[in-house]
């Protein structure tokens, strides 16, 4: 009987894998046909203005249209996740070469067409921002291996002195702070057992509002905390790279948004779910003693954060540029050399797919710019919404990205849309920083659905939070985020 049930389970899994593969193949074929159809239509109608020097140049028109068709294909693949989004990222340089996309260059007074070389198409995968993020993963690995993340969390929660309100806010605060430096997913997963330990002392039925407040507080604080630093969330790095922002420059933008959204989130959750904080609770503590390695880890963390924040001043002192990536790689080298984490630890805790996704997004950006596809797309969008007031455009873009990432990967959305909206901003005479930062920050502000972010899925998986709870609170927070992100960035750069 047992053997039969195991066989049935294996067959069910196999059928599921086959149906998933079939779905992926069908979507790839449909995406290819739709993209090719767009290419044919654009070649026949040419519904956009062409620079005077390219009028009558059919090769230029075909090159632009190939770039736009590639953009559509990648968009369908990333949003549908027909294959893993990392694989789609790796497709981008391959497709650019196969499709014969290139750029026009002037040589000896004459204009000639040059096909993309594979080395050019792959250059995005060696971008310094990728290594900055890798250093962030190495730092997070060291904190996790030495249990310093948990030690900090337990210490702050223990300060509540049995006060449920203070403990609840403390859990959310720790989640937010750790998420500035550690993966949002890892932070939420680590904080969940601490929260469940507190909630186990309450009545699940009578204190349901308290359950939902604390659990959603953890999920949302993890997402909000990721806004504070470049390494907090992948979309931050994508936007920062487009704007050539360093670690400190990003913090000047991301940190205020984080500090505004955090209290608004807790207030919103309190008003909606009306938790009962009158209970006295017992805080379970775990003895994590200070060791030489833990002290060294704290020192490495503090020095790395200091170097990131004060990179410009350090550059002036040392006489060479202290780049974010240089600091990150130095931290990774030190971490392994002094033995506070092994290479295996770092490799296991690094999300390599995110790093490749970065590279694919940067490759796509280069292809769109060099083929003039992004310029043409910007003109077309500008013609449609060019008469709208700037503040309306800003709020519409904020709403678009925030609700879009309820259904799609925030990193993939940012990788696709940041280069596009950078060009659209120029065509609309809007400072590029406004739309790029709205895409970069807004991509992390998805609060409404369990599938929107890993932290949402983690707390939903406990069974204590219903989807209607998340939708109710998330809708309000999405609207708040649209206003906060849109208005703050607009006021900063308009």
Regions from the language model: what does each represent?
Residues 201-212, 271-288, 337-346, 431, ...:
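Alpha-helical transmembrane segments
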Residues 144-148, 158-163, 198-211, 239-249, ...:
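Juxtamembrane helix-boundary/capping and inter-helix hinge elements in multi-pass membrane proteins
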Residues 1-132, 249-379, 476-482, 486-494:
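Hydrophobic transmembrane alpha-helices of multi-pass small-molecule transporters
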């Amino acid at each position: 009987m047992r053997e039969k049930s195991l066989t049935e389970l294996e067959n069910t899994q196999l059928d599921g894998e086959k149906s998933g593969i079939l779905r992926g193949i069908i979507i790839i074929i449909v995406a290819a046909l739709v993209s090719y159809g767009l290419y044919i239509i654009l070649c026949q109608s040419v519904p956009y203005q062409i620079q005077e020097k390219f009028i009558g140049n059919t090769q230029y028109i075909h090159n632009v249209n190939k770039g736009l068709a590639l953009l559509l294909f990648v968009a369908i693949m990333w949003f549908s996740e027909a294959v893993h989004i990392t694989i789609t990222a790796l497709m981008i340089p391959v497709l650019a070469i196969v499709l014969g996309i290139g750029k026009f260059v002037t040589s000896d007074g004459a204009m000639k067409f040059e096909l993309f070389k594979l080395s050019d198409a792959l250059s995005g995968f060696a971008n310094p921002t990728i290594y900055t993020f890798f250093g962030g993963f190495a730092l997070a690995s060291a904190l996790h291996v030495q249990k310093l993340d948990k030690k900090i969390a337990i210490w702050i929660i223990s300060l509540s002195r049995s006060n449920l309100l203070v403990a609840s806010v403390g859990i959310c605060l720790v989640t937010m702070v750790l998420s500035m430096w550690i993966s949002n997913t890892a932070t939420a997963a680590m904080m969940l057992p601490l929260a469940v330990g507190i909630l186990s002392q309450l009545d699940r039925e009578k204190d349901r509002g308290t359950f939902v407040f604390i659990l959603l507080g953890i999920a949302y604080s993890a997402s909000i905390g990721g806004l504070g630093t470049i390494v907090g969330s992948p979309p931050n790095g994508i936007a920062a790279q487009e704007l050539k922002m360093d670690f400190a420059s990003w913090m000047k933008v991301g940190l205020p948004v984080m500090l505004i959204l955090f209290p608004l989130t807790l207030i919103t959750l309190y008003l909606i779910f009306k938790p009962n904080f009158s209970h006295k609770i017992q805080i379970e503590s775990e003895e994590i003693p200070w060791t030489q390695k833990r002290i060294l880890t704290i020192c490495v963390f503090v020095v790395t954060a200091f170097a990131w924040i004060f990179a410009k001043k350090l550059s002036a002192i040392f006489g060479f540029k202290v780049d974010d990536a240089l600091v990150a790689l130095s931290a990774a080298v030190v971490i392994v050399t002094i033995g506070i984490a092994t290479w295996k630890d770092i490799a296991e805790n690094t999300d390599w797919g995110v790093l490749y996704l970065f590279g694919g997004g940067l490759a796509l950006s280069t292809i769109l710019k060099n083929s003039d596809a992004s310029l043409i797309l910007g003109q077309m969008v500008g013609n449609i919404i060019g008469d709208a007031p700037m503040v309306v455009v800003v709020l519409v873009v904020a709403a678009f990205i925030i609700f879009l990432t309820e259904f799609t990967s925030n990193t993939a959305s940012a990788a696709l849309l940041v280069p596009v909206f950078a060009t659209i901003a120029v065509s609309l005479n809007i400072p590029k920083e406004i739309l790029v930062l709205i895409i970069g920050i807004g991509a992390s502000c998805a609060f409404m659905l369990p599938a929107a972010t890993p932290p949402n899925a983690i707390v939903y998986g406990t069974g204590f939070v219903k989807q209607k709870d998340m939708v109710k609170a998330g809708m309000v927070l999405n609207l708040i985020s649209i206003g906060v992100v849109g208005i703050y960035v607009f006021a900063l750069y308009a």
